[in-house]
Amino acid sequence: MGQKSNPIGLRLKIVGTWDSLWYANRDYATKLHEDLLLRSFVKKTFHHAAVSKVVIARKVDAVIINIHSARPGVIIGKKGVDIDRIKQKIAKMVNHEVELHIVEVKKPDLKAVLIAENIAQQLEKRVSFRRAMKRGVQNCLKMGAKGVKVSCAGRLGGAEIARTEWYKEGSVPLHTFRANIDYSCVEAKTIYGIVGVKVWVYVGDSRAVVE
């Protein structure tokens, strides 16, 4: 039942890898909780910087954080002032030295999380859900995606009864393990209640598996 499982978790080590690159013999739960707090902090602090992914690695005496963003200039700030301030805040949270790296996302329209966040923002501004979905799908296909599917669930357009509507173009093979599928789920907080936005982006087969 490929449609019932998270496409990213299903393909770990086949197509992608984990976002937390460390191992711990003890205090594993504490470190994992720390990771969740760090991701939440980065997302909230740079909510306007189009952050697609936060990868965390750990050394014995340091925490290395790679922030993947479509707008790196917003994170760095003038002469790197903002990034130094954030470094100090994170260092206090984890009680370790912090290395912060900013990775630029070249094609933000191919990242499922950024597409979902963009659609959610439009829904919060009371844009028609059909228009928002169609625009997101078309922009993604223009950037070279082989297939995109977008689903919106909730009180769409202020309807009394919640329902799910979806829009799909191209191919999205959820049952093919070698298929490189990016997936994201975001909540839009509208005046009628929460609307769930899910996005699947198929960018092609993984070269490593094909070879």
From Swiss-Prot:
Organism domain of life: Bacteria
Residues covered by the KH type-2 domain: 38-106
Gene Ontology terms: cellular component: cytosolic small ribosomal subunit
Keyword presence, Ribonucleoprotein: yes
Keyword Ribonucleoprotein: yes
Keywords: Ribonucleoprotein, Ribosomal protein, RNA-binding, rRNA-binding
Pfam families: KH_2, Ribosomal_S3_C
GO molecular function, one term: structural constituent of ribosome
Function in brief: Binds the lower part of the 30S subunit head. Binds mRNA in the 70S ribosome, positioning it for translation.
Family assignment from sequence similarity: Belongs to the universal ribosomal protein uS3 family.
Family annotation (NCBIfam families): rpsC_bact
Subunit architecture: Part of the 30S ribosomal subunit. Forms a tight complex with proteins S10 and S14.
Protein name: Small ribosomal subunit protein uS3
Natural source organism: Anaplasma phagocytophilum (strain HZ)
Gene: rpsC
